[in-house]
């Protein structure tokens, strides 16, 4: 410490002591904050549809489409409705199928039910459902549920609504 000849502390020494006491106080106060930050944060986990399984589902749907025969578009989406894969067969029936298939899959995910169920609701007790913006209420969309968890959806658009539904069901048979 700096002392004057008279034995008294200089102003610089008093200032340094004051600063040191503030630093010690801040450090002592921050110890609980550091301890609180060190605790792990629990984040929710969710089931996801792996790409390899999406491919297997699509392959089964393609095989069914070829067996009918009914070429078209098959789309697989994740649980947020984002496309994982989309396949347009060589002789797809309609150009609109490239838009319909992923929208059917997305609608099945967002409503957590078959689009055949949605189509029946629109045709029957819930005609106002058709006003839901951005959804396709046509057969051919199915949610993909594994171990009770919604992980995605499949959407099919080929030549007829019944074929759409049959092909989507064939894809789902992979996980049942």
Which residues does each predicted region cover?
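Secondary-structure junction/capping motif
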Residues: 15-17, 114
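Bacterial N-terminal signal peptides
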Residues: 17-32
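Intrinsic structural disorder/low-complexity segments
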Residues: 5-7, 18, 152
